[in-house]
Amino acid sequence: ALAAGGWVVCDRFTDATFAYQGYGRQLDLEKLAVLESWIQGDLQPDITLYLDVAPDVAAQRIAAREKDRMEVERRDFFVRVRQGYLDRASEHERFEIIDAGNPLQEVQAEVRLKTSEFIRRAHRG
């Protein structure tokens, strides 16, 4: 799709690798960067929407439903993962941070707004 000039939407990219494996599991960030470069070259998303939520709010939400394999991790793991995303966001202008601690309808509206703004800029550019 990219080669044909199309758009690709992903729910995860290498930012998740840095956050979960690098920060969460404390793997070597430099080695992850080498792998990222080797696998994807200079390919990066044009925009990244990061839905940020405080670890305590996330824990409350997780407790209200069935957990998956990642959600059984300890709180300190998620604190490190969140910091990984926030660090990546501070290093890359493509990040749009959305406060996912807000009610669902507000988060959805913010996602729609950021996506619409990006599409308008892309069509002008």
Per-region residue spans from a language model:
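Hydrophobic/aromatic beta-strand patches that form the interior of the parallel beta-sheet core
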Residues: 9, 47-49, 96-98
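NTP-dependent small-molecule kinase module
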Residues: 56-125
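A glycine- and Lys/Arg-enriched "phosphate-lid" helix/loop adjacent to the NTP-binding pocket
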Residues: 12, 17-83
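N-terminal phosphate/diphosphate-binding loop that engages ATP/GTP or pyrophosphate donors
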Residues: 1
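Loop/turn-to-beta-strand initiation segments
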Residues: 4-7
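Short, well-ordered beta-to-alpha junction loops that form the rim of enzyme active sites
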Residues: 11-13, 100-101
